Amino acid sequence: MKKAPAGSFPAKPTIAPERPILVFDSGIGGLTVLREARVVMPDRRFVYIADDAGFPYGNWEEEALKRRIIELFGEFIANYDPEIAVIACNTASTLVLEDLRRAYPSVPFVGTVPAIKPAAERTSSGLVSVLATPGTVKRAYTRDLIQSFASRCHVRLVGVDGLAAIAEAHIRGESFDEALVMAQIAPCFIEKGGKRTDIVVLACTHYPFLVNVLRRLAPWPVDWLDPAEAIARRMKSLLPARSDDDEFHSQDDLAFFTSRKPDYAIRRLMQGFGLRF
């Protein structure tokens, strides 16, 4: 039997590069989902992508926006080879999620849709409002959710323009008109038959950044329902469990902006979230 040459050792197992979780939004709102995902999956690697060159999505014609997102994901998948992709944007999810699944069947996609089912389960008064972009409000998908899960509730859809942009200004530390915010959320608050709205669904991932402002401006206390935690749990459920023997190259979490020129405030924000450009 041949002896191994002196000084030789068994070959080390190959350490695979870690496939990241890709979190996508039109701007910085998806950071609310990333934050919860890191709590649920602290050992995973993330790439955060903001389509700031296309922001805000509410200004787009639907077919043009659909084509844009599908084409962008072709580049993202080729560049990052994600283990899973999260559409951390209600507008994009209700528009293009199924098309993305058909276009890229090898990648699991998780969408962000209005949290109407949990709202219907939690409400005591039966009066629920959904605060969203006009695009999310007008989609048949949103109405189907109401019909399927909240048919016994009175659900008011409130579509607002500009609140996502106000959230971006707020997170940058810029001033904004609180009277405008108050006017936009006012239709969410209904009094009917001696009962009041008790849940407002935040159906845009930007809005949780404003939640303290919303609480202060609201005419009475409500549960502002943020779906980020549920999205994070769904992501984890679709990923294979890791064992203690799994080894991966340690790599930084990344941020990519489609404009390729995020300003100083955004760069600071991304660094605060532990994201490298």
Swiss-Prot record:
It catalyses: L-glutamate = D-glutamate. Pathway: Cell wall biogenesis; peptidoglycan biosynthesis. InterPro entries: Asp/Glu/hydantoin_racemase, Asp/Glu_race, Asp/Glu_racemase_AS_1, Asp/Glu_racemase_AS_2, Glu_race. Substrate binds at D25, S26, Y57, G58, N90, T91, T205, H206. This is Glutamate racemase. Its EC number is 5.1.1.3. It comes from Brucella ovis (strain ATCC 25840 / 63/290 / NCTC 10512). Belongs to the aspartate/glutamate racemases family. It comes from the Bacteria. GO terms for biological process: cell wall organization; peptidoglycan biosynthetic process; regulation of cell shape. GO terms for molecular function: glutamate racemase activity. Keywords: Cell shape, Cell wall biogenesis/degradation, Isomerase, Peptidoglycan synthesis. It is an enzyme of class 5 (isomerase). Provides the (R)-glutamate required for cell wall biosynthesis. The active site is at C89 (proton donor/acceptor), C204 (proton donor/acceptor).
